[in-house]
Amino acid sequence: MYNAHSRGRLSCALITGFIATGSAFSMSGQAIAAGPFDPDAAGMTGDWGGTRSELLQKGYDFTLDYVGELGYNARGGYDQDRTARWSGQFTLGAKLDLEKIFGWHDATFKLAITEREGRNITNDRISDLRAPMYSSTQEVWGRGQTWRLTQMWISQSYLDQKLNVKFGRFGEGEDFNSFPCDFQNLALCGSQMGNWAGSGIWFNWPISQWAGRVKYELAPQVFVQVGAYEHNPSLLEDNNGFKLNLSGGEGLILPIELLWTPTVNSLPGEYRVGAYYSTADAADVESREVPGDVSSDLVSRDSKYGYWLVAQQQVTTHDGDPARGLSLFANVTVQDRETSQVGHFIQAGLTYKGLFDARPQDDLGLGVARVSTNSRYRDNQKALNQANNQTDYDNPAYQPVQGNEYDAELYYGVHATKWLIIRPNVQYVRHPGGVSEVDNAWVAGVKIQSSF
């Protein structure tokens, strides 16, 4: 049977093959080409005897990346039996410059295949599984521990690069509500809309669906973009990682976003404000077909929507070096009250690049987030407990009533080489899952990012 152990053996074989290939190219190539494990090379396997650089010049960029995350429940949580969990993801990618290869003006093709494996300390120790933790202390875990087609798209620019059109297989968070993923806590990593819109609505990495996106430059540093994405919950299933047909589709996700990329005092910033509308049916979180009867079905709504704001701005340099310094960030998402478990989400924090002169590439990050349960969803939980005569939290039949969850993380990123970053971190979770009965948790973690 093909299982996690089989995937692990296949992953090791992929790494071994790439390293062996890189070594062979290095031995046969020019002496000046970066060899395997060269700290200044783009990847661990080096420049393949100059072949990697030659391919890049011709428009071919092949990559193999790995992200691994360790989580240890140091204190608190639902289950206080101490242990550690490891989750990881391999990404095999290709980016082709179609202008260099075929002469297609300003055209790019991107392909990415991912494989996830491992376990999550959040599920195993921190959460009360009757009301799981909203965030995750190991963001790389999730969406199925399996192989997936994550990107397969083509984009092309027109009108002196003012207009860009993109079509193929990709997720909403790749272009809309986008945000970096340097933190290990999910509430501080990546597009947040996908975390709180609902598990079957907005698909973040590594899920892809058929989609199209049009982006236009309204003025220097000001862009507007719109998109249309297939809404197909069956794509979440583990055995549908490479599904290309439209069976199981339920509607469309239609996002729109205004993007501003100013320079303030010659320092870069990025600001996004946007909204999405879903044409798919969604269940109301409180209203019943038979009012007051919790055994009846929830009312079905014919749409769903939400809004977001993302802000990032570098505010200082370090000794006059603009590549180093302090940056601030914030994220806000708001969901419709009729169909959303999470009503709104707020996040803020800072990063500092090159804090120490001896380590100019290292980075430090501190972030906090609050996930707020929709009051209508909470009222439904209370009604269920009342109807079932449940008042004791320790009774397995009791439905924990969810409020606000708070997540915080402090990390230090050691840029050991150009292709290896190690980020030890400490995370604090107050009221995991918004459940006040669950002890506040401390998690020690390590995030590793490597390019081969």
Predicted feature descriptions by range:
Residues F242, E257-L259, A275-Y305, T316-D319, ...:
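Outer membrane beta-barrel transmembrane domains
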Residues F62-L70, F109-E115, V165-R169, V226-E230, ...:
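Transmembrane beta-barrel strands of outer-membrane/channel proteins
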Residues N440-F452:
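Outer-membrane beta-barrel "beta-signal"
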Residues Y72-G88, F102-Q151, L246-G248, G434:
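Surface-exposed loop and membrane-interface regions of Gram-negative outer-membrane beta-barrel proteins
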Residues Y2-A4, G8, C12-E69, N73, ...:
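N-terminal periplasmic/intermembrane-space "pro-region" immediately following the signal or transit peptide
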Residues S53, G68, L96-K100, S155-Y158, ...:
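Residue-level signature of outer-membrane beta-barrel architecture
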Residues T122-W153, D160-L254, N385-A397:
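Surface-exposed coil loops of outer-membrane beta-barrel proteins
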Residues G46-F62, D97-F109, L159-K162, Q221, ...:
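Short loop/turn motifs that connect adjacent beta-strands in outer-membrane beta-barrel proteins
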